[in-house]
């Protein structure tokens, strides 16, 4: 949760707690006596707060405080009312001092104590005094509190005070507890964990958390982030450039003219003419291609794709025979994925499986990646996801690519 959102909630929460203190005042009057010269201005302050005239209410509290020779109980009631009025008037320092005085008096009923401590912790957070917010939040739990809002406030205070290791540890504990209970962790919790890892330069922790966010709350911007980081991962292979583009295209993150051109060219070079044509047509349809000084170049690439498709149709039988005659299954895998992306998904699955069975593959995990995607293209999503999940080889980044396709496929229609 970013600080501005939590502050808004904290301000509202502080106001609710302050109104509780006002509502509880009549009951407190019944316990011990308050002299009229103290009680009347306090009653007036209470009435003013009910109409949101908090600064006027503070003036009445000061009037009560000016009465000489106050009893400890009268002082307690004055500070209690001052805390409520100051909270409503957004006078944080005054509210904090008053709340601390109320707690220190020892006169607050046991039933009220936790709410007062919660209000104090919240007030410290609103004042950006994060160490004090953590201190009073800890006391809240020590005295038996169990409110999730205070725990969130404490973790956010750890983050804001620069203790990113602590905010990561506590956020992760909450998230894991939610998952064990079968609940989706709150998006705010996951974002806080991600930011805690990011501040520690813990890239693996950050990526793992973004993957959780994609699982529970998929967003285009998150996909853009994780795909970008994937390419920067040490050891990530350039051979997977086309696979990265495929993820960008699927998640709505292929946007620039250069990206459309490069992806189309890579697809054509890989022998996937139909895939290249699809990319080119999408680029023309959304305005990324066909405009500007390079418009003629874009049209020539489209013509080349159409030519390659026509050639592939003529040579399909011969190419399949040649792949079947090869000593290894590499050509069958390449041809099978080309079939899968050209509207022949079922045939593509069959061809890739034949290539895997033949063996001698240069990169077996790449072959399983394309088999999983081919199954998904064929409408057998569950089978495809199962295969993608089985990819354990991370040579060059293929396992990372497979994992992202699992996340995407699980959330797509």
Predicted regions and their residues:
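Alpha-helical repeat scaffolds
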Residues: 61-62, 93-103, 130-141, 165-177, ...
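C-terminal soluble interaction/assembly domains
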Residues: 327-413
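Generic helix N-cap/helix-start motif at coil->alpha-helix transitions
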Residues: 34-43, 72-79, 109-119, 144-153, ...
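Solenoid-like repeat scaffolds
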Residues: 31-34, 65-71, 101-110, 138-146, ...
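Structural motif corresponding to the intra-repeat A-B loop/turn of tetratricopeptide repeats
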Residues: 51, 89, 127, 161, ...
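Residue at a conserved register position within TPR or TPR-like alpha-solenoid repeats
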Residues: 48, 82, 86, 124, ...
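Surface-exposed, polar helix/loop patches in the mature regions of secreted/periplasmic/lumenal proteins
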Residues: 89-154
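N-terminal leader/linker segments that initiate helical-solenoid repeat arrays
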Residues: 2, 6, 11, 15-16, ...
């Amino acid at each position: 949760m970013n600080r501005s959102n939590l502050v808004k909630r904290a301000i509202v929460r502080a106001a609710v707690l302050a109104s509780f203190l006002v509502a509880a005042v009549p009951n407190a009057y019944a316990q011990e006596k308050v002299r009229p010269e103290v009680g009347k201005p306090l009653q007036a302050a209470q009435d003013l707060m009910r109409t949101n005239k908090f600064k006027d209410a503070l003036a009445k509290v000061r009037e009560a405080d000016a009465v000489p020779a106050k009893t400890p109980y009268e002082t307690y009631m004055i500070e209690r009312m001052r805390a409520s009025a100051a909270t409503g008037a957004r006078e944080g320092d005054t509210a904090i001092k008053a709340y601390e005085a109320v707690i220190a008096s020892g006169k607050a009923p046991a039933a009220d104590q936790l709410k007062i401590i919660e209000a104090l912790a919240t007030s410290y957070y609103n004042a950006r005094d994060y160490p004090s917010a953590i201190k009073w939040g800890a006391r809240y739990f020590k005295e038996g509190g169990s409110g999730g809002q205070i725990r969130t406030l404490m973790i956010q205070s750890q983050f804001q005070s620069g203790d990113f290791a602590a905010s990561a540890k506590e956020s992760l504990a909450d998230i894991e507890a939610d998952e064990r209970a079968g609940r989706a962790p709150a998006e705010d919790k996951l974002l806080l964990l991600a930011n805690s890892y990011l501040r520690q330069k813990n890239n693996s922790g950050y990526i793992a958390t973004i993957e959780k966010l994609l699982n529970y709350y998929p967003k285009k911007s998150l996909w853009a982030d994780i795909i970008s980081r994937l390419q920067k991962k040490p050891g990530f292979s350039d051979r997977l450039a086309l696979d990265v583009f495929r993820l960008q295209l699927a998640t709505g993150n292929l946007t620039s003219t250069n990206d459309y051109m490069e992806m189309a060219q890579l697809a054509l070079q890989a022998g996937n003419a139909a895939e290249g044509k699809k990319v080119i047509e999408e680029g023309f349809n959304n305005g990324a291609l066909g405009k500007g000084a390079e418009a003629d170049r874009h049209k020539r690439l489209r013509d080349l794709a159409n030519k390659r498709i026509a050639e592939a149709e003529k040579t399909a039988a011969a190419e399949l025979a040649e792949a079947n005659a090869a000593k290894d299954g590499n050509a069958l895998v390449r041809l099978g994925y080309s079939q899968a992306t050209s509207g022949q998904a079922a045939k593509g699955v069959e061809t890739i499986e034949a290539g895997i069975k033949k063996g001698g593959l240069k990169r077996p995990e790449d072959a399983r990646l394309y088999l999983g995607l081919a199954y998904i293209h064929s409408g057998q999503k569950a089978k495809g996801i199962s295969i993608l999940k089985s990819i354990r080889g991370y040579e060059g980044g293929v396992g990372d690519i497979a994992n992202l396709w699992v996340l995407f496929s699980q959330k797509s229609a």
